[in-house]
A protein has these predicted regions:
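AMP-binding/adenylate-forming domain of the ANL superfamily
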Residues: 1-20, 35-38, 53
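Conserved pre-ATP/AMP-binding loop-to-beta segment of ANL
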Residues: 3-5, 14-17, 97-109, 116, ...
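Conserved AMP-binding/adenylate-forming core of the ANL superfamily
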Residues: 17-47, 61, 86-90
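Conserved AMP-binding/adenylate-forming
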Residues: 26, 42-85, 151
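Conserved AMP-binding A3 loop
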Residues: 29-31, 105-132
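Conserved S/T- and glycine-rich ATP-binding loop of Class I adenylate-forming
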Residues: 54, 71, 110-113, 146
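Conserved AMP-binding loop of ANL adenylate-forming enzymes
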Residues: 56, 138-159
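Flexible, low-complexity linker/hinge segments
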Residues: 86-104, 131
Length: 159
């Protein structure tokens, strides 16, 4: 299940020096972001194992993007958690995921409108289809920039 998302983009012919990520503090090319992701993956490699589900508090920032891409590269399933959750909610999510293994690309949490929130496995194909459908509907080109307006803990924020 290991997925090197940036390498897949480059393999499709993207310019390594094209803008991949823009934050208030900096801009990242595909090549620069790939280096940062490889470094993060090397740091995490000894701490986690392929197939593991890894709960991760995510913010809408560069570090969270790098963390998610590094986990995917290692074949680890991130379970992004909203930093606005209470300590009790975060603890419950981490307890529920303890020891869980998955081949999913991510595990995102439902809102709990029909009961208690639960983790839902999301595939890479599903995330890709969502992103491609959004790009097609909005007529996006390689020159456009996408604003990360949804939390990375939300399925729409991952796509």
């Amino acid at each position: 299940m290991a997925t090197d998302v940036l390498q897949a983009v480059l393999d499709r012919g993207a310019d390594p020096e094209s803008l991949a990520l823009l934050s208030p503090d900096s801009g990242w090319t595909l090549a620069g972001l790939q280096v940062a992701v490889h470094q993060k993956a090397a740091e995490l490699k000894e701490l986690i194992e392929q197939g593991q589900v890894y709960p991760l508090i995510v913010h809408q920032d560069v570090d969270s993007v790098i963390d998610m891409l590094a986990l995917w590269q290692l074949g680890v399933t991130p379970a992004p958690l909203n930093p606005k959750l209470t300590q009790a909610e975060l603890a419950a999510a981490k307890t529920a995921l303890s020891g869980v293994r998955s081949e999913a690309q991510a595990i995102v949490w439902t809102s709990g409108t029909a009961g208690r929130p639960r983790g839902v496995e999301v595939s890479f194909a599903g995330l890709s289809a969502n992103a491609e459908a959004s790009a097609a509907r909005l007529l996006l080109t390689d020159d456009d920039v996408w604003a990360a307006s949804l939390s990375f803990a939300h399925v729409g924020g991952l796509a």
